[in-house]
Amino acid sequence: MTNILSPEKSENDQELPIRPSYLQEFVGQQQIKENLLVFIKAAKSRNEHLDHTLFYGPPGLGKTTLAKIISNEIGGNFKSTAGPAIIKAADLAAILTNLEKNDVLFIDEIHRLNTLVEEILYSAMEDFELDIIIGEGSAARSVKITLPKFTLIGATTRFGMLSNSLRDRFGIPMRLNFYNTEELKQVLNRASKLLDIDLTDSGSEEIAKRSRGTPRIALRLLRRIRDFAVVDGKLRIDKEICDFGLKRLTVDSIGLDSNDYRYLKFIADNYHGGPVGIETIAAALSEQRDELEETIEPYLIKIGLVKRTPRGRVITIAAFEHLKMPIPNKSQHQFNILNENE
């Protein structure tokens, strides 16, 4: 699924020269920032490495950025890879043996590590040792390699898919949450200054309200609205040009797009509001289940349009009202039951 409101990273997002380098520049996630400052300061004062850190939560909230910031704050090199890229034990060994003291190894999508690689990672995280097999057959022998004290930072959007053994080895687990409108305005205002964009307060507010609580989406929308402003001869990005551009991008007043409407209308039209299983929804919409669970559902659940139940997905009264559709009696009964159980 590729669209303007996808929280997943795209190649175009990487061109923005606005990534903060230190915690004081990072907007939002205030409690995480404050705690990280304490943990980093304490590790430095003891002349120790920072404990292994796990960032989890919806995509687009700053997990990679925070990993790079930690590297800058502790003064180590930053090495980056992804779970699916580490196929064999030898791949992991090559990465680990090239680390230096206080380096940060960032593994994105760490929930996608295969079991064999994950088991080798345990001793590297706990004991800073790596056991590798040299040779084959009867000539094979195990060699223990001592690793420098490094910090592993894992990132995942699927916390529940991590094994307990891997989760327990992270001394600093941190959940990143969606941003509120004011925080997104701060992100946009900072970016507009760095990109030399004249963004009004009303324009910033309009983009922030429709960015699904996600900085990556807010910055992407800012770039696209800048395009509309340039072509339209506008020197300033205000509420009017934002509203025009966002309508052209089919982003509605609360940040929903055509993919969200397809999802909601399928449940409303075909199942009277639900419940309906996620596999059925994915098949009907020709989407992967993971895509729905990671890019569409989190925001719809956050704003109260969808509920996950043991029997499947249910859309709420608020969803019917936003769709401007009548509420079926069957669904009304289900909503009453759900509300009583909350």
Curated annotation (Swiss-Prot):
Known partners and oligomeric status: Homohexamer. Forms an RuvA(8)-RuvB(12)-Holliday junction (HJ) complex. HJ DNA is sandwiched between 2 RuvA tetramers; dsDNA enters through RuvA and exits via RuvB. An RuvB hexamer assembles on each DNA strand where it exits the tetramer. Each RuvB hexamer is contacted by two RuvA subunits (via domain III) on 2 adjacent RuvB subunits; this complex drives branch migration. In the full resolvosome a probable DNA-RuvA(4)-RuvB(12)-RuvC(2) complex forms which resolves the HJ.
Recorded family membership: Belongs to the RuvB family.
Subcellular location: Cytoplasm
CDD domains per UniProt: AAA
Binding site residues for Mg(2+): T64
Region of interest (Small ATPAse domain (RuvB-S)), ranges: 180-250
Binding site for ATP: I18, R19, G60, K63, T64, T65, E126, D127, F128, R169, Y179, R216
Organism of derivation: Rickettsia typhi (strain ATCC VR-144 / Wilmington)
Gene coding for it: ruvB
Residues covered by region (Head domain (RuvB-H)): 253-342
Region of interest (Large ATPase domain (RuvB-L)), ranges: 1-179
GO MF, any single term: four-way junction helicase activity
Protein name: Holliday junction branch migration complex subunit RuvB
Keyword Repeat: no
Gene Ontology biological-process annotations: DNA recombination; DNA repair
